[in-house]
A protein has these predicted regions:
Chain B
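Generic, ordered loop/turn and secondary-structure boundary motif
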Residues: 7, 12-14, 20, 43, ...
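A short, ordered amphipathic alpha-helix with a cationic face
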Residues: 18-24, 55-58, 66-67, 78-80
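Helix-rich interaction surfaces within compact, conserved domain-sized segments
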Residues: 13, 65-105
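Metallocofactor- and cofactor-centric catalytic cores in central/energy metabolism, strongly enriched
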Residues: 30, 35-54, 58-59, 66, ...
Length: 160, 105
């Protein structure tokens, strides 16, 4: 491990989650939870399809993208077969469970309990016609991009 | 590695201040380390978490991460962060004289 003790430690991160797939959401959640575990302040900001992860109807049903996802090593036409995304999602979810990773809803509840701020994007909410009532209770507010930058001031911004 | 004096005893610590030898630990060291990290007084609740971490480490060879600490210690994640705002699993492990929990969750 390389360590740079000279560098200023990170004290705050604001993480944007913009993708609505299982593999698109987990990294941002892991980074937010990991930040809090290290005593780093963290805000999570869900935008565009990423908002599904905090949508009451969708957060339990996030799926792995099987089309246009070369990392999965499944040919696109096979990935497009109906039911393929559910199948791959089930396989990956069972792996995730075996590793003792939390599910997305449990993860979001946990991150909220760590004191991290969880927000949704106003432009995306308007686009999809979502209101605060459509989103899970952990979402503290639907905010503008300007409010996001104000909140992120003095820290690092990570876009996923 | 560095040597430092904790509660009147010379101990070896790593770059983040974790004890290198868990067997050198005592409760006075926990209090001294907590003070250095901005927790002036360790309450019974703090000690409950610290002792739980230490017992788990001694029994299993590794310390629980924050998620399993919240599930098994009898103290909720919310409360854990109130007790140890700068990272409950990390700080409770440090004050317990055991290595930092390893893992991404």
């Amino acid at each position: 491990m390389t360590e740079n003790n000279e560098a200023e430690p990170i004290s705050k991160v604001s993480i944007v989650i913009s993708k609505g797939s299982l593999e698109g959401v987990y990294p941002g959640l892991i980074m937010a939870n990991g930040a809090r575990a290290e005593g780093i302040d963290a805000n999570l900001f869900f935008t565009f399809f990423g908002m599904d992860a905090v949508h009451k109807k969708h957060w339990k049903n996030m799926k792995v993208a099987t089309v246009g996802n070369p990392g999965l090593h499944i040919p696109t036409l096979i990935g497009a077969i109906p039911g393929m995304s559910s199948l791959v999602t089930r396989m990956m979810s069972s792996k995730i469970e075996k590793l003792d990773f939390p599910s997305i809803p449990e993860f979001i509840e946990m991150i909220s309990d760590t004191g991290a701020g969880i927000y949704a994007c106003l432009a995306s909410a308007d686009l999809f016609g979502y209101t605060k009532d459509d989103l899970v209770d952990q979402v503290e507010g639907i905010i503008t991009v300007g409010e996001f930058y104000t909140m992120a001031a003095g820290g690092q911004i990570i876009f996923t | 590695m560095a040597t430092k004096s904790l509660a009147g005893q010379d101990v070896e610590v790593d770059a983040e201040g974790f004890l290198v030898d868990a067997s050198q630990w005592n409760e006075d060291m926990a209090r001294a380390m907590a003070k250095e990290d901005g927790i002036d007084e360790l309450t019974d609740k703090h000690m409950q978490v610290i002792n739980f971490m230490r017992n788990e480490y001694m029994a299993k060879g590794s310390a629980p991460n924050i998620r399993s600490l919240g599930k098994t210690s009898g103290v909720s994640i919310k409360e854990l962060y109130q007790l140890f705002p700068k990272g409950p699993a990390k700080l409770a492990a440090k004050f317990a004289g055991i290595p930092k929990p390893h893992g991404c969750i």
